[in-house]
């Protein structure tokens, strides 16, 4: 049997990504990272995407209550090796502990823009016009 050639993540990648997300969230919630920026910010880890070989974990995070996300992302990336070390006890089943990279999650901003577009008068008028025809 041949492997599928699609670029969609495998079930294993999704499962491991969710486990890594939960482990990173626990490390951040416990306050194990000693950094003023990280300790003063509530950080939401929305998704972790694993590379196909499971050696790189890209964590998409949203710092809440901070206008400049780049400062928090830089602080997280500075402490990525420490966080990686703290993931070990929770991810014992993995042969290699993944390298963790933090990225800003812009999906909430994208959802907000789409919602604003759907609520705009032009789109509302078009949607109402579709209902009149039916």
Swiss-Prot record:
Q: Name one Pfam family in it.
A: RBFA
Keyword Cytoplasm tagged: yes
What PROSITE patterns would the database entry show? Answer: RBFA
Q: Which UniProt keywords apply?
A: Cytoplasm, Ribosome biogenesis
Instruction: Please give the SUPFAM superfamilies that the UniProt record associates with this protein.
Output: Ribosome-binding factor A, RbfA
Q: Which cysteines are joined by disulfide bonds?
A: none
Q: Which InterPro entries match?
A: KH_dom-like_a/b, RbfA, RbfA_dom_sf, Ribosome-bd_factorA_CS
Q: Which GO terms describe its molecular function?
A: ribosomal small subunit binding
Main subcellular location of this protein, as a coarse class: cytoplasm
Q: Which GO terms describe its cellular component?
A: cytosol
Report the locations given in the UniProt record: Cytoplasm
**Cytoplasm in keyword set:** yes
**Can you cite a GO biological process for this protein?**
maturation of SSU-rRNA
Gene3D superfamilies, per the entry:
3.30.300.20
Protein purpose: One of several proteins that assist in the late maturation steps of the functional core of the 30S ribosomal subunit. Associates with free 30S ribosomal subunits (but not with 30S subunits that are part of 70S ribosomes or polysomes). Required for efficient processing of 16S rRNA. May interact with the 5'-terminal helix region of 16S rRNA.
PANTHER family, sorted: RIBOSOME-BINDING FACTOR A, CHLOROPLASTIC-RELATED (PTHR33515:SF1)
Its family?
A: Belongs to the RbfA family.
NCBIfam families (alphabetical)? PRK00521.2-5, rbfA
On subunit structure and binding partners, the annotation says: Monomer. Binds 30S ribosomal subunits, but not 50S ribosomal subunits or 70S ribosomes.
- Please report the name of this protein according to its UniProt entry: Ribosome-binding factor A
Supply the source organism for this entry.
Answer: Rhizobium johnstonii (strain DSM 114642 / LMG 32736 / 3841) (Rhizobium leguminosarum bv. viciae)
Protein encoded by which gene: rbfA
């Amino acid at each position: 049997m041949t492997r599928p050639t699609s670029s969609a993540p495998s079930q294993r990648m999704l499962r491991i990504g969710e486990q890594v997300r939960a482990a990173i969230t626990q490390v951040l919630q416990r306050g194990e990272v000693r950094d003023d920026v990280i300790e003063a910010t509530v950080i939401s880890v929305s998704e972790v995407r694993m590379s196909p070989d499971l050696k790189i974990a890209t964590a998409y995070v949203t710092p809440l209550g901070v206008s400049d996300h780049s400062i928090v992302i830089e602080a997280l990336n500075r402490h990525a090796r420490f966080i990686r070390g703290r993931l070990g006890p929770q991810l014992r089943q993995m042969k290699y502990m993944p390298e963790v990279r933090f990225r800003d999650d812009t999906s909430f901003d994208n959802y907000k823009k789409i919602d604003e577009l759907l609520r705009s008068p032009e789109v509302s008028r078009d949607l109402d016009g579709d209902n009149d025809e039916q």
